[in-house]
Structures are given as structure tokens and as C-alpha cells.
Amino acid sequence: MASNNDSIKKTLFVVIALSLVCSIIVSTAAVGLRDKQKVNAVLDKQSKIVEVAGINESGSVPELFAKYIEPRLIDFKTGNFVDGDATAYDQRKASKDPAQSIKLTAEQDKAKIIRRANTGVVYLVKSGDEISKVIVPVHGNGLWSMMYAFVAVETDGNTVSGITYYEQGETPGLGGEVENPSWRAQFVGKKLFDDNHQPAIKVVKGGAPAGSEHGVDGLSGATLTSNGVQHTFDFWLGDMGFGPFLAKVRDGGLN
């Protein structure tokens, strides 16, 4: 009888020990995977910024980013630069914190983002000792997802030099075409603002008129996603978004 009890105890001990070992292995692997995912997310974001900046030099993404890109923080209300570590700042996280953000009214919330952080990140593209472009991150709701993009702007604060979407979950082949290079190429050379400095980008269903300064073709079969792109620009070019900052850029506030 005692022998049977000893055998049961040994079996239980082995089972418990194996369970603990397996738990430790799984936990360690999960932590390692999360860390790797974070690193990959940062690398992918940097890659998109380098791409939209038009940097074609050979080298690793981290090297090119460090050499040519300077992240800076701005106060959305004034458009002024503010002190702080822009590299460590998480604007998405800040927008969810009532102490670091504001809740938008229905009238203000054209892009359907609900809250906007008080502080934003912009990326200055360096050319020697001067700034050649600025990159502003924008996001807005599409049909199925929040769509995140980077828009590169010349130092006139008005002319688009590139756009790239780095996170979206729209329908492949329809709204997902926001990532199509041919569609994105339409934005190059477009003017963000009209002569009165009001947001002027227009995503036109059926196609923008030839030679339009502000118009780009809507996405075929993806009206709601196209509307989301329109509303994204309407919000982020306005007074609640990067409007005040881009006005300072337009007035020569970079170099």
C-alpha cells in the first residue's frame, strides 16, 4: 500500500514539475515573441518613413533613419515644437489617456478617431544642415478599419511629395488599394491647401479632373474607404490637426 502511495506521489511530482517547466518555457517564448514583434513594428514604421521621404541611398533602415530623419514633438494647438523624447513618445497611447488628449465633438471628429492627443510627432527630413521635407502621420476610419498613413510635404508646407499607408484593414483589391503605388502616386505634386489656406485635397468618385491641383481619383468600388481618406485629410489638415504646424512651415519656420 505504501509502495502504491509513493508511486502516486512520484507521478504527481513529475506531472507538476513538467507543467511548471512547460509554463516557464511558454512564458519565456511569449515574452521573447512580444519583444521581437515590437522591434519589427518599429523597423516597419521606420522603413515606411524612409520610403515616403524619398531616400534611395543604400544602407540599413535604422542607419538611414538615424542619418536623415529627425522626429520632433509639436503642440497641436499652437503648431509649435515642444521639448520631449519624440522617439519614445507613443501618440496612439497618449490619445487614449484623458490627461494627454481631448475628446472630439461630433462636428470636430471628421476622421472618426474619437480622441486626439495634445502632442503629436512629426518627422523632419534632413538634407545637410537644412530640412528638405516634413512628414506628418495621419489616420482616419475607413470602411472596416482605422487607416494609418505618412504624408511627406515639401518645405512650402503645401506640396505633397509622397504618401504611404502603413497600417489598414480594408478589403483587399478594393479599399486595400490605398497601398497601391499607382494610386498613391497621384498625390505627388498636389496642393494640400487652397489660396485661402483651407484644406483642399479632394478624393473624387469617378476620377478627378485632369490637371487638378487638389484632386485625386477615388478608389474604384470602395466609396466608403475613399470617403475615409477624404475625411482623414479634412481633419488632419485643419485647425485640430497639423494645420497650425503646416502654417508655420509655410511661413519658413523650419530652416
From Swiss-Prot:
Keyword terms: Cell inner membrane, Cell membrane, Flavoprotein, FMN, Ion transport, Membrane, NAD, Phosphoprotein, Sodium, Sodium transport, Translocase, Transmembrane, Transmembrane helix, Transport, Ubiquinone
GO molecular function: FMN binding; oxidoreductase activity, acting on NAD(P)H, quinone or similar compound as acceptor
Keyword Transport: yes
E.C. number(s) listed in UniProt: 7.2.1.1
InterPro entries named in the record: FMN-bd, NqrC
Residue ranges crossing the lipid bilayer per the database entry: 12-32
Sites of FMN phosphoryl threonine modification: 223
GO BP, one annotated term: sodium ion transport
NCBIfam families, A to Z: nqrC (TIGR01938), PRK05346.1-1 (NF003746), PRK05346.1-5 (NF003749)
Protein name stated in the entry: Na(+)-translocating NADH-quinone reductase subunit C
Organism: Vibrio anguillarum (Listonella anguillarum)
